[in-house]
A protein has these predicted regions:
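Amphipathic alpha-helical interface elements
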Residues: 1-172
Length: 172
């Protein structure tokens, strides 16, 4: 299925944001047990169900690292905000500062992934947000930095990407 340049550019940038946020969780909470009651058990249960559905086998691990790929975008930043003491202060402060912007990305992400019509301001909103992340801390936002650099060098590279079909059925 062919998609337009704007949709694929947004897809690349939002995917990079999600990858970086997941890596933040893996780096700082990945070894934590999913049985730790300080974590939202409903979130963990949803992620376990998604993992089992995707892989046709039962969940047999006990760490957050094994589930982080099955968290929604909104769940990822909420998890970081819920446990600021588990992250370096610079990261927890930045996520808290950028929570409203991350919340604004969720409907954009859903429009892209579910092949809904884009709003006229979706691309500039995501582009500006990525530039802010890079300006604030390029070492934290490695995937975002690399993706934006790649886009600046060759904007058409996104036309070779594909939006995973399974992404069409999941909300962020």
């Amino acid at each position: 299925m062919a998609y337009n340049l704007s949709r694929m550019t947004i897809y690349a940038m939002v995917s990079a944001i999600e990858e970086d946020l997941r890596e933040i969780i893996r780096s700082h909470l990945g070894s934590k047990s999913t049985s730790d009651k300080s974590f939202d058990q409903a979130l963990l249960d949803r992620a376990k169900i998604r993992l089992e559905k995707d892989n046709s086998y039962g969940y047999d691990s006990d760490t957050l690292a094994s589930l982080v790929d099955y968290f929604d975008l909104g769940d990822i930043y909420q998890l970081i905000n819920s446990h600021p003491d588990k992250f370096p202060k610079t990261i927890s402060d930045e996520i808290k500062l950028r929570t409203k912007s991350l919340q604004a990305l969720v409907p954009v992400r859903n429009r892209v992934m579910h092949i809904r019509p884009l709003n006229f301001n979706d691309l500039p909103l995501v582009t500006d947000f990525c530039e802010e992340l890079i300006y604030s801390s390029p070492s934290t936002w490695i995937n975002v930095t690399n993706t934006v650099s790649h886009l600046k060098a060759d904007p058409s590279f996104v036309l070779g990407l594909s939006i995973p079909r399974e992404g069409l059925n999941n909300e962020a």
